[in-house]
């Protein structure tokens, strides 16, 4: 196979103000249709609560509120994952602030000990660790037919990839986050520091081929760019996956998971964005990137964080307009 450089030197293309407007292509009905199909797909009541690395053996428990339900997670001495109500059944202590002793969760108020089995009114929740993200099944929150496992997107093999997980919280609902990701046309206008020369080459055609296909160049520095083709799909009601299908890093994915923190009827909803990036490459030099993955992960999170400053503003604005009957889409 002929070698090609991973970076390209972009020619004198149009600047931000001179690029082709995309508002005609970004038809509100098209985005709304893709969103409706996504949000009606089953989830089995599974919610992403964080990165697998957030819950470690021998460390303090990890807490998250999902749909108004407090959840606590911890690991046994053998690395097994446990999850359940974050409220102590004795007097309501926040178990996320308790301690793990020899794999047992011990309440810091009165010493009630939980090994993960039902006890004294405390109930465990089904939990799944896919190797990168941790999922909890909350049947009362989801209200769907439960499934044994969540729908985990196909990812590059972990041994040949570098991954990072970024988390942020916004004042909006999950659908506002999903709608943002199902609007690829905003990329080079709203994020000119990261994307350029973006064009949507194929729109969704329904459930049989429900994907946006996008040609875009990622900015590296100055005129140096990485051109790729990417596909956006929504395998579940709170998940959007961007997968590079052609170009540098083919098979790499960015999974965006939107987890509601508040009840569905909350006047000021809050949603956690948990975004997992799994980068892969068949170039021999990528082995070096894997070797220094601990150094790269903070940089990957910083890149995601910069984008989500803007995208959460988009999602929060969308919710603010929807909640007051002013959203034009």
Regions found by a protein language model. Give the residues of each.
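Rieske [2Fe-2S] iron-sulfur-binding domain
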Residues: 50-155
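C-terminal catalytic domain of Rieske-type non-heme iron oxygenases
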Residues: 149-329
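Tryptophan-centered short beta-strand motifs
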Residues: 43-46, 81, 160
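Short Pro/Gly-enriched beta-strand edge/turn motifs at strand-loop
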Residues: 43-57, 109, 181-184, 237-241
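Short beta-strand-initiation
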Residues: 44, 57-59, 69, 122, ...
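A short, structural micro-pattern
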Residues: 43, 121, 128-130, 252, ...
């Amino acid at each position: 196979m002929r070698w090609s450089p991973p970076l390209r030197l972009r020619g004198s293309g149009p600047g931000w103000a001179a690029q082709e407007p995309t508002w005609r292509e970004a038809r509100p009905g098209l985005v709304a249709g893709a969103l409706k199909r996504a949000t009606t797909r089953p989830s089995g009541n599974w919610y992403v609560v964080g990165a697998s690395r957030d819950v470690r053996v021998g460390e303090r428990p990890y807490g998250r509120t999902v749909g108004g339900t407090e959840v606590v997670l911890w690991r046994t001495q053998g690395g097994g994952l446990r999850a359940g109500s974050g409220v102590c059944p004795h007097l309501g202590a926040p178990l996320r602030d308790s301690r793990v002793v020899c794999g047992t969760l011990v309440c810091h108020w009165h010493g009630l000990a939980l090994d993960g089995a039902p006890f004294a009114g405390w109930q465990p929740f089904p939990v799944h660790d896919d190797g990168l993200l941790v999922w909890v099944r909350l049947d009362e929150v989801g209200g769907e037919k439960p499934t044994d496992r969540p729908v985990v997107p196909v990812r590059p093999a972990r041994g040949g990839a570098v991954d990072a997980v970024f988390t942020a919280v916004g004042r909006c609902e999950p659908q506002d986050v999903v709608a943002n990701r199902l609007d690829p046309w905003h990329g080079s206008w709203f994020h000119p520091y990261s994307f350029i020369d973006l064009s949507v080459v194929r729109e969704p055609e329904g459930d049989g081929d429900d994907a946006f296909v996008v040609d875009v160049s990622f900015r590296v520095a100055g005129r140096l760019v990485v051109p790729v083709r990417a596909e956006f799909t929504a395998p579940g009601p709170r998940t959007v996956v961007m997968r590079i299908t052609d170009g540098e890093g083919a098979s790499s994915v960015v999974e965006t998971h939107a987890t509601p923190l508040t009840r569905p009827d909350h006047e000021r909803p809050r949603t956690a964005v948990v975004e997992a990036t799994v980068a892969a490459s068949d170039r021999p030099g990528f082995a070096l990137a894997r070797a220094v993955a601990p150094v790269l992960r903070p940089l990957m999170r910083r890149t995601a964080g910069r984008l989500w400053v803007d995208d959460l503003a988009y999602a929060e604005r969308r919710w603010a307009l929807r909640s007051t009957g002013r959203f034009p889409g």
